[in-house]
Regions:
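Outer-membrane beta-barrel porins/channels
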Residues: 1-250
Length: 250
């Protein structure tokens, strides 16, 4: 749906080979659309035995306001075959929330130098990813247009297993595996949310220069997954992720 001059101009864009709304920015850590809100998390740990600890946590669904850009923080454009249409305005992402999540975990000190951990998480995607809703309000020609991308994600179970070996007082080596069922039905998958990978394999090491200074490095690999959407679009996705972290304790 929509209103005003912008909504009236949409039929003229029907012959465009492409049209898009861009509200990205050059910041690696924050986007152009921002919101405030709150969330909460509860957890407990029980030392069941000297070598065994059990844990549980619950993360509440977020309560975020609508994410908005500035008044001219988004652009709507179309290909030259539609008359090179360009407009600026505000993009609003409506009621986008992070889901509730429950987790159970166990840690076992198998030997003085080997720690084994495992946990299982249940993520309630179905409650927050039914539809991705947006509204564009033109600051140029006036009017607005509302958009919705059906998602219909399913709830997801994620299992993690990892091991850490203290090679000596300074060096710790780590490895792990993560498996999750795919939360996105093939019919609704799209490049905006290519969250189709199901498995991750990780390696890591930590080196303590002193009790107060430590360097940690990790690598995660997600094998390639290929999915064809209901519209016939094929999406392939794999991941390589490297992290480097230096810690200083005061």
């Amino acid at each position: 749906g929509g209103s005003g001059n912008l909504y009236g101009a949409l039929p003229a864009l029907g012959g465009a080979s492409w049209a898009r709304i861009d509200f990205s920015n050059s910041n690696d850590f924050t986007g152009a659309a921002k919101a405030t809100g709150w969330a909460g998390k509860l957890g407990l740990v029980w030392r069941a035995a000297p070598e065994v600890s059990l844990g549980a946590s619950y993360q509440f669904k977020t309560s975020l306001g609508d994410m908005k850009t500035s008044r001219t923080g988004a652009t709507l454009s179309a290909s030259p075959d539609a008359g090179s249409f360009t407009d600026s305005g505000r993009m609003t992402v409506l009621d986008f929330q992070w889901p509730a999540m429950a987790a159970l975990g166990v840690a076992w000190q198998a030997t003085p130098t080997v720690l084994v951990g495992a946990d299982v998480k249940r993520i309630e995607w179905a409650d927050v990813m039914k539809s991705f809703k947006m509204r564009y309000d033109s600051a140029g020609i006036g009017g607005s247009v509302s958009l919705a991308l059906p998602q219909h994600w399913k709830n997801q179970t994620v299992t993690n297993v990892g091991v850490a070996w203290s090679a000596n007082a300074q060096l710790t080596l780590r490895a792990g595996v993560n498996h999750a069922d795919n939360a996105i039905p093939d019919l609704y998958v799209n490049p905006i949310f290519p969250a189709t990978v199901e498995d991750h394999y990780t390696l890591g090491l930590g080196y303590a220069f002193t009790p107060a200074h430590e360097l940690n490095v990790s690598y995660a690999y997600a094998p390639r997954v290929k999915v064809t959407s209901g519209g016939g679009v094929t999406i392939t996705h794999k991941q390589h992720n490297v992290q480097l972290m230096y810690s200083a304790r005061f």
